[in-house]
Design a protein with these regions (language model features):
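PRPP-associated nucleotide enzymes
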Residues: 1-158
């Protein structure tokens, strides 16, 4: 373990198991739709989580990426959101699952949900590996949550 890391919150095995459970949940929820889902990762933090999750989804599954920032130069959300890279895919009429690594203040995700809903997807849900409930400033309905975690700066997955 790195000298600057205080403790391990979740083991590799716990994370693998929970990602498999989330993938099974998504598979179950969309099993009757032949088009499956499009996973959208918020770069860069969620890219590894999304790739691991996609391997656990037993349906047609496309992946796309956005880069969105509300952190500026710090580690706390500034509330000012910028799209740095938009989607390559069209999402109109499609089932969208946004994959986040850490759901923190919810401000960035609120902006992202509003932006993507305007593109008329068939459905839109959110999955997050980690949710910091104590920091939430915006109410986000998260269909698939990996773990609740403390309101601390977190590193280590991906």
């Amino acid at each position: 373990m790195h000298e600057n890391i205080d403790r391990i919150l979740f083991t590799e095995d716990e994370i693998k198991q929970r990602v498999a459970e989330i993938g099974a949940g998504i598979t179950q929820d969309y099993k009757d739709d032949p088009d499956g889902v499009i996973l959208i990762s918020v770069l860069r933090g969620a890219a590894i989580f999304m790739a691991d999750l996609a391997r656990q989804i037993q349906l047609p599954c496309e992946m796309d990426y956005m880069a969105v920032s509300s952190y500026g130069n710090g580690v706390k959300s500034s509330g000012v959101v910028r799209i740095l890279k938009d989607l390559s895919s069209q999402i109109e009429g499609r089932n969208v699952v946004i994959a986040e690594d850490v759901l923190d203040s919810g401000l960035t995700l609120t902006y992202l949900l509003k932006t993507l809903k305007a593109r008329n997807p068939k459905s839109i849900e959110v999955t997050t590996l980690l949710r910091k409930k104590t920091r939430a400033q915006a109410k986000i309905d998260c269909a698939y949550v990996g773990f609740e975690c403390p309101d601390e700066f977190i590193v280590g997955y991906g």
